[in-house]
Amino acid sequence: MKKLIDISSTMLPLNMSNVDTDQIMPKQFLKRVERSGYGEFLFFDWKKNPDFSLNKKEYQGSKVLVAGDNFGTGSSREHAPWGLQDWGFDAIISTKFADIFKLNSINIGLLPIETSLQNVEGLFEKIEKDPSTNVHISVDKKSVKCEEIEFMFDLDDFSQKRILEGLDKIDITLDYMSDIENFNESRKNWKPRLT
């Protein structure tokens, strides 16, 4: 997992509410378990429309997706955050995320940022006025700044540490390897062991 400390980027607008994981990553592309190679399938059906924001030249290379209310609803599929990250997004800003989508995103180092409707609408207005507008996100300070729009976001300390240091679940487990080995050595032989 890559480390995320600061993100400075243009933003890609997705001004739609209740975008579910099947729209983000359609079910026909869920046959693999690798984490990479999903970017091309992101919003697959919507990309057939040449006016869809992912198709527009001015938004190519954006690392921040600004989405409408209630992003990532529906079934739990890790492939949806994988596709977003594979496309190049490091962060998503919305008013609300489905809990499991939020957790799946944090687990791979994709930063979900919840904020007020006023802030999201303000960002949409900035993007519409000038697609080259940059946003600056500090994971360390838990802050977002885009010109005069400034706000803080909630992120628990453990998730913040994981994103700042690029730690996935395996990395975290390996940090406790000596404790695991000590536990195994102290257990009676007839009891099950962690190996």
Task: Annotate each language-model stretch with its function.
Residues 1-68, 72-195:
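Cytosolic catalytic domains that perform sulfur/thiol-centered chemistry
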